[in-house]
C-alpha cells in the first residue's frame, strides 16, 4: 500500500468508523453520556489517527479519530473531551482496572479512576485486549513489520505468498541483531516471541511514542525497529531513502474502537 493510498484509505474509513461509533456496542452508555453532556475520548498519539501536542496552556489536537469522535459528540448534542493516555494506561482509563500484558496474558491490577467512554486511536485488536475490552467492527488493516536503516546489512525478504512463512523468514534474519521494541503497545516483543529468535531486543528508557521509533534507529539506538503498517508508511514518506522494510513480524492485524466489556 502506497502512502497516497494510505491517506485515501484513511479518509474513506472515516465514514465507516462513524457508523461504528453509533453501533449498539454501547447503547446503554449513550444515555449516560447524554445525561453527563460530554463524550470522553481516550486517545494515545499515533500516526494520523491522533496527534496531540501540549505546550503550556496551548493544546493542539488533530487526527482522523479525533474528527470522527468530535463529529459523533456533535450528533449526540454533547461536548467533546479528549483524555490523553499512554499505551500502558489507556485500558485502565476506560475500564477502571489497570491491565498489563505480562507473561503472554492480561494481568489485572489495581482499580483506577474511569476517565473515558471509548478508546479511539487506531487500536489494534489483540487477543489479550479482547479479553478485557469489547471492540467495534474493525475499520483499518494493520500489521507489524521490521524496519531498518538503509545502511543496515539486513535485506528485505522476497515475499513467499504466505504471511506465516514470511514472518518465519524475518525472524531467522534477526538472530543476534538489534531490534527496538515498545512494551504495552502493538510493538510489544512478547506478542511475537521476539526473545525466542535470539534477537537483541532493545526497550526504550522511559515513555516513547510509536512515531519516535524510526528517529531512534536513525540516531543509532538500534539497527532496526518493530513498526506497524500505518507508522511505516508515514515514515517512508518522511525519510525517503533512509529506511527500508525488511518484512512482517506479525500476521495481518486489524484496528477498531474499544469499549468497556459492560457496554452491551
Task: Tell me what each language-model feature is.
Residues 28-122, 204-206:
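Extracytoplasmic small-molecule ligand-binding "clamshell" domains
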Residues 11-21:
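Hydrophobic helical h-region of N-terminal Sec-dependent signal peptides
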Residues 78, 86, 123-187:
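A conserved helix-loop-strand patch within extracytoplasmic ligand-binding domains
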Residues 72, 94-97, 173, 213-218, ...:
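Hydrophobic residues within well-ordered alpha-helices
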Residues 88-92, 106-131, 189-194, 215-251:
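A ligand-binding cleft/hinge motif common to bilobed small-molecule-binding domains
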Residues 45, 139-148, 153-155, 210-211, ...:
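Periplasmic-binding protein-like
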Residues 21-27:
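Sec/Tat signal peptide C-region and signal peptidase I cleavage site
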Residues 2-13:
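Bacterial N-terminal signal peptides that target proteins for export
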Amino acid at each position: 500500500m502506497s502512502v497516497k493510498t494510505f491517506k485515501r484509505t484513511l479518509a474513506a474509513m472515516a465514514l465507516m468508523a462513524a457508523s461504528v461509533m453509533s453501533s449498539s456496542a454501547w447503547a446503554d452508555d449513550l444515555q449516560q453520556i447524554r445525561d453527563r453532556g460530554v463524550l470522553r475520548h481516550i486517545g494515545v498519539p499515533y500516526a494520523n489517527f491522533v496527534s496531540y501536542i501540549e505546550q503550556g496552556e496551548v493544546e493542539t489536537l488533530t487526527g482522523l479519530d479525533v474528527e470522527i469522535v468530535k463529529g459523533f459528540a456533535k450528533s449526540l448534542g454533547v461536548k467533546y473531551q479528549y483524555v490523553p493516555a499512554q499505551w500502558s494506561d489507556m485500558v485502565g482509563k476506560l475500564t477502571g482496572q489497570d491491565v498489563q500484558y505480562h507473561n503472554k496474558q492480561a494481568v489485572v491490577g489495581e482499580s483506577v479512576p474511569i476517565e473515558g467512554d471509548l478508546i479511539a486511536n487506531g487500536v489494534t485488536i489483540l487477543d489479550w485486549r479482547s479479553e478485557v475490552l469489547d471492540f467495534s467492527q474493525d475499520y483499518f488493516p494493520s500489521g507489524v513489520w521490521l524496519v531498518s536503516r538503509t545502511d543496515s546489512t539486513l535485506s528485505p525478504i522476497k515475499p513467499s505468498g504466505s504471511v506465516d512463512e514470511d514472518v518465519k523468514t524475518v525472524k531467522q534474519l534477526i538472530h543476534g541483531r538489534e531490534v527496538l521494541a515498545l512494551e504495552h503497545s502493538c510493538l510489544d516483543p512478547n506478542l511475537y516471541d521476539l526473545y525466542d529468535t535470539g534477537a537483541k531486543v532493545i526497550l526504550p528508557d522511559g515513555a516513547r511514542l510509536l512515531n519516535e521509533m524510526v528517529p531512534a534507529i536513525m540516531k543509532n539506538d538500534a539497527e532496526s525497529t518493530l513498526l506497524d503498517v500505518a507508522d511505516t508508511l508515514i515514515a517512508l514518506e518522511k525519510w525517503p531513502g533512509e529506511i527500508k522494510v525488511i518484512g512482517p513480524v506479525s500476521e495481518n492485524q486489524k484496528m477498531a474502537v474499544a469499549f468497556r466489556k459492560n457496554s452491551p
